[in-house]
């Protein structure tokens, strides 16, 4: 399954001229806008994405004129706490669990809040290093979305990708995103996005590639301990792991020697803590 997914990613990359993760990061670091596409079995849409700290009125105007979607600001959980942003709804009923906070506006320096200049100003205020809750008012014309800890390795959304990519670029982990619609108001799909990118000289990246890149270069799971464990089938080595993003624990029972050069059979079972002993 993993191999077939990677083969599909390579085919898409070759067929549509998809940029590498490194190229997308370089574009964001340079203050340019990119297109980011998620999976066909998810929202199957492309968003315009740029690093929030480089936002300009011209960039906002481009997004609303050519992207036509909702201008959102991806923020980390930490930044949302810093700004004391309440969630938009107590119960999130959206299909993909997008974590909208209440919409925001800069407290000073804006007029009605809807102009490109006003929206850029609001974003600049929200991502300033020393930003405080009093710097913003609610509601407003910018829609923050809160990324889950762990980023795309936990949730494969544009929200998490925006924060991940800007952080990987060495920038403030926040991005301005806007969905791309076709002139008739329907969602632009990959072939449409390729044409759009060529028309506006924008590079296209995929969230699938970002997930693969992060999976190959880092891990959110760390080993916290191990000990021998006697079972009805002999002695196993019990290895405990902790998920750094969620704090949840995982237990691996290993029998024999494990080598990266030899394919190792793996069996995955989900047990509650009180069920573990009775099943060993």
Model-derived features: where do they sit?
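Single conserved hydrophobic/aromatic residue that forms the stacking wall/gate
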Residues: 1-8, 12, 270-273, 277-280
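N-terminal, positively charged regions that mediate nucleic acid binding
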Residues: 13-45, 49-56
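Structured core elements
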Residues: 35-37, 49, 72, 101-103, ...
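Extended, low-hydrophobicity, polar/charged segments
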Residues: 41-42, 51, 61, 80-82, ...
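Conserved mixed alpha/beta catalytic, RNA-binding, or beta-rich assembly cores of soluble enzyme
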Residues: 47, 52-57, 62, 107-158, ...
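Glycine-rich, N-terminal phosphate-binding loop and its surrounding beta-alpha-beta segment
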Residues: 56-115
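Long, charged alpha-helical interface segments
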Residues: 194-198, 202-203, 207-268
């Amino acid at each position: 399954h993993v191999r077939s997914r990677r083969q599909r990613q390579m085919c898409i990359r070759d067929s549509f001229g998809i940029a590498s993760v490194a190229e997308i990061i370089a574009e964001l670091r340079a203050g340019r806008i990119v297109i980011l596409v998620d999976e066909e079995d998810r929202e199957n849409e492309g968003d315009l994405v740029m690093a929030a700290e480089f936002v300009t009125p011209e960039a906002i105007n481009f997004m609303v004129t050519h992207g036509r979607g909702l201008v959102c600001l991806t923020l980390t959980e930490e930044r949302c706490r810093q700004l004391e942003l309440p969630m938009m709804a107590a119960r999130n009923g959206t299909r993909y669990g997008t974590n909208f906070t209440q919409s925001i506006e800069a407290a000073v320096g804006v007029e009605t809040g809807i102009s490109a200049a006003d929206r850029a100003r609001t974003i600049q205020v929200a991502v300033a290093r020393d930003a405080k809750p009093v710097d913003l008012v609610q509601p407003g014309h910018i829609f923050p979305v809160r990324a889950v800890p762990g980023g795309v390795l936990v949730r494969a959304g544009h929200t998490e990708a925006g924060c991940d990519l800007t952080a990987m670029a060495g920038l403030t982990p926040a991005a301005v995103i806007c969905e791309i619609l076709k002139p008739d108001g329907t969602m632009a799909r990959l072939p449409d996005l390729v044409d759009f990118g060529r028309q506006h000289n924008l590079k296209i990246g995929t969230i699938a590639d970002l997930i693969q890149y992060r999976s190959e270069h880092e891990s959110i799971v760390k080993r916290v301990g191990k000990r021998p464990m006697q079972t009805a089938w002999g002695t196993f080595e019990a290895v405990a792991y902790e998920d750094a993003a969620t704090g949840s624990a995982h237990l691996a029972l290993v029998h024999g020697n494990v080598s990266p050069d030899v394919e190792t059979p793996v069996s995955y079972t989900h047990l509650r803590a009180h069920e573990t002993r009775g099943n060993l």
